[in-house]
């Protein structure tokens, strides 16, 4: 099974990707995480990618496509995966279809701009276990103590400020809305209400994928 999660930054793709991947025992491939890992390396490619991220610009298709292809053609992904954040436009979708022949399901997370901004601005995670929190909606039960592992060290994403987030949303709309129209005609396109809580969204996705 190959499942693509589409939606703007802050839509909840990463949270649901991890949940559903664990439930159906498939890898969750988060494109943002892949590129954040690359940025931490001391390479010219990392510097180039980091410049795009800082400015709120999308990374060029040729860079994204090659990185993703290298990942997806690995043997560990031969049985399927949940793909979070790719493709983001028609060019990427057609490149993806050129080397992936399996049937896919596309799930789009529909969320208002106002809610997206709060979700992204408030987002942080436990540095030890990766548990995601939000200063607006989901704080640890005990201040500065992770609910899962008890760590008191948290990671706040440096590229998350309101101006950059708004720009990322607008760039996303320009790039991705034509892709959504393209996938709507595929017969395997589904929309979930991303403003619901985590449990409700998870249930909606399980129904789409026909899993318990």
Swiss-Prot record:
Pathway: Purine metabolism; AMP biosynthesis via salvage pathway; AMP from ADP: step 1/1. Residues 122-160 are annotated as: LID. It catalyses: AMP + ATP = 2 ADP. Gene3D superfamilies: P-loop containing nucleotide triphosphate hydrolases. Keywords: ATP-binding, Cytoplasm, Kinase, Metal-binding, Nucleotide biosynthesis, Nucleotide-binding, Transferase, Zinc. Zn(2+) binds at residues 126, 129, 146, 149. AMP binds at residues 36, 57-59, 85-88, 92, 157, 168. GO terms for molecular function: adenylate kinase activity; ATP binding; zinc ion binding. It is found in: Cytoplasm. Its main location: cytoplasm. Its EC number is 2.7.4.3. ATP binds at residues 10-15, 123, 132-133, 196. It comes from the Bacteria. Belongs to the adenylate kinase family. Catalyzes the reversible transfer of the terminal phosphate group between ATP and AMP. Plays an important role in cellular energy homeostasis and in adenine nucleotide metabolism. This is Adenylate kinase. It comes from Rickettsia felis (strain ATCC VR-1525 / URRWXCal2) (Rickettsia azadi). The gene is adk.
């Amino acid at each position: 099974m190959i499942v693509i999660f589409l939606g703007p930054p802050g839509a909840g793709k990463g949270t649901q990707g991890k949940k559903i991947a664990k439930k159906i025992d498939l890898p969750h491939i988060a494109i943002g995480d892949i590129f954040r890992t690359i940025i931490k390396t001391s390479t010219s490619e990392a510097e180039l990618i980091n410049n795009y991220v800082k400015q709120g610009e999308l990374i060029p298709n040729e860079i994204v496509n090659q990185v993703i292809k290298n990942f997806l053609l690995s043997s560990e992904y031969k049985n399927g995966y949940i793909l979070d954040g790719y493709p983001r436009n028609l060019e990427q979708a057609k490149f993806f279809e050129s080397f992936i022949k399996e049937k896919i399901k596309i799930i789009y997370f529909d969320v208002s701009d106002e809610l997206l901004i709060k979700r992204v601005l408030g987002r942080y995670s436990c540095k030890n276990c990766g548990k995601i929190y939000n200063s607006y909606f989901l704080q640890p039960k005990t201040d500065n103590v992770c609910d899962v592992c008890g760590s008191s060290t948290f990671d706040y994403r440096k590229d998350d400020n309101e101006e950059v987030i708004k720009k990322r949303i607008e760039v996303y709309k320009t790039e991705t809305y034509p892709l959504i129209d393209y996938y709507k005609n595929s017969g395997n396109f589904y929309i979930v209400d991303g403003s619901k809580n985590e449990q409700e969204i998870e249930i909606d996705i399980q129904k789409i994928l026909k899993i318990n």
